[in-house]
Amino acid sequence: MKTKTYRFVCLVASVLTLQLMNGSSAATPPPPPNSKNSSTSCNRTCGGISIPFPFGIGGKDCYLNGWYEVVCNATTSGSSGTTVPFLSRINREVVNISLPEGNNEQYGVVHIKGPVTSLGCSSNTSQVPQKSLPDLNVTGKGSPYFITDENRLVAVGCGTKALMTDIESEILGCESSCKDSKSSQEVTNLLCDGYKCCQARIPVERPQAVGVNIESSGGDGCKVAFLSSKRYSPSNVTIPEQFHAGGYVVVELGWYFATTDSRFRNPLGCINLTYSGSYLSGDSCLCEYGYFSEMSYRNCYCSLGFTGNPYLRGGCIDNDDCKGPNICEEGTCVNVPGGYRCDPKPKIIKPAKPLVLQGVLLGLMGLLFLVVGTLGLIIFIKKRRRIISSRKFFKRNGGLLLKQQLTTTNDGNVDMSRLFSSEELKKATDNFSVKRVLGKGSQGTVYKGMMVDGKIIAVKRSKVVDEDKLEKFINEIILLSQINHRNIVKLIGCCLETEVPILVYEYIPNGDMFKRLHDESDDYAMTWEVRLRIAIEIAGALTYMHSAASFPIYHRDIKTTNILLDEKYGAKVSDFGTSRSVTIDQTHLTTMVAGTFGYMDPEYFLSSQYTDKSDVYSFGVVLVELITGEKPLSRIRSEEGRGLATHFLEAMKENRVIDIIDIRIKEESKLDQLMAVAKLARKCLSRKGIKRPNMREASLELERIRSSPEDLEAHIENDDEEDQVMEISRE
């Protein structure tokens, strides 16, 4: 509640008149400060905070007197070049400055940073209260400041007793407790009612100095007390540590435009104040004149319909009141100084109706038929073009080649009725929105989609196809049509009538294994048991491709990014863009080298002959990733061991493989079991393909490792001397 502004009654006006008449011969009334200079040549912002006159930064013409001087200092924290404003006379950082606004706010407001008094919050055990800043004191000759009743004394913590000091009239305070009971102190903030927090009002006489003292009334822990503005009160006031760490709170100071000379006749911006203290009407601003603490003061504010700074000449600017909605419902709004008026709208005389409308109606009907016919023709042409384009794209995207492959394939299982239209897939993927992207690969981009029936799908949109890549796309369709295995991604259908070919797969929700292994932000860390199961499932899928499918299929790009994980973290082998099938009697393929560095078989790289053992080598790298949790290529490792396979083989050779085991599984895994898998990985990474096991042997070995841990040591001891690994205990 703000204090009323007292105005002069006749007796006070008479006394002032006598004083002015007696003093007119002795002294000349002082001129008003140069408000013009203060507005044109002075900096009016500091650190993003507006500094309105009578406050100012710079020379003496920029502010009324020393009480209103603001210094713009560089801050010691935060980003370089940041500045903060300080009130020079009281040496406090300014948070906000506002001018009086009409009759409802009869003084201006300055928000400053105030101190926090704490007890038991620092590392030392001293029970002496600590203050982040000195107590607030705005006293002094000519001081226009006072502490408003918008502030509250607040105590936070268990058993915290806070008292206001430096107030002569009374002793005020409050006490908080951790017992769930209501405080007897009158409060208005229901979040601070005595439980862990209490508050007390500031006395209404507007003191200029208030100190805060804190005492412990029982209980340990951090306790704080402070004076704070209700406007800047935090939402959670039950945690004392956050106030102690912050080091300050915001305090509201009221200020008057004060002067000690009652002969100060004219205000800075308003010229309507009379000699006796009353004011005239009709100007852009108003001023009030009275007494407070035996000091004459004057507050000015812009009149209704004006905004700005009344302490500057011409500082109050007329508002355009006609910008508001529905100002004049039945007329035209005209802005006038300080308000607006509503002028009646001119009457509109409607033209007389034509006597003959037949010609106009006939013309409109003819135009309508012409428009309808034109639109129908345009629709027909567009539909025809779409059909031609669809046929063209179907042919260009390998539709004819696909039909030819299907007719020459002994066991083709592709259901040609599962061809999707482009409109279906656009609707399912929100027109292939970037928000739907699941991943990008060498062959194209994969989107998440949802069909009309609610089924979730993965849509692989190939890159712009040229003749060289067309065979790879058709090859992937043919290969996936021949595969029926629970650990291999299932092909649902395809779309060939778009500019770029599209494949539709079953949706695998948990993404690829590479991200789950190497993304540190992933909350789920795969256990050794899960990793071993994934390895067995991958081995089973590759065994099926190599020996159980209609034709042996070599994947040619086995890596963790091409291994997806379903909702139960089951493995699904994907991305068959570079895969090749061979006849039963073929032992290898001679092709251009394709694959991913870090996973590529060195024997294949040198000879360009890809065999089933090349897939085994890539599988060995995946096993090492599961064991170590490291990436296949890393700049962190030495130049010689930058590749994970080389790094792992050196560790096996030096009997220190235990040192490179993933720390996330090191403690919970069975060491004998893990070492047996490491030995299998070493065999898969043999430089010569003939020394590597085939995928069926690797799959059976992994099954044996999981199901028969008692036989592991015997198998390890029976290895060749070259591959032997010493037993390494956790100790």
UniProtKB/Swiss-Prot annotation:
Stretches of the chain found on the membrane's Extracellular side: 27-360
Primary location: membrane
Annotated localization: Membrane
Glycosylation sites: N37, N43, N73, N96, N124, N137, N236, N272
Pfam families: GUB_WAK_bind, Pkinase, WAK
Domain Protein kinase: 432-705
Keyword terms: ATP-binding, Disulfide bond, Glycoprotein, Kinase, Membrane, Nucleotide-binding, Phosphoprotein, Serine/threonine-protein kinase, Signal, Transferase, Transmembrane, Transmembrane helix
GO MF assignments: ATP binding; calcium ion binding; polysaccharide binding; protein serine kinase activity; protein serine/threonine kinase activity
Domain commentary: The EGF-like region is specific to this family of proteins and seems to consist of the C-terminal of an EGF-like domain fused to the N-terminal of another one.
Function: Serine/threonine-protein kinase that may function as a signaling receptor of extracellular matrix component. May be involved in plant's response to pathogen infection.
Protein name: Wall-associated receptor kinase-like 5
Top-level taxonomy: Eukaryota, Viridiplantae, Streptophyta, Embryophyta, Tracheophyta
Gene: WAKL5
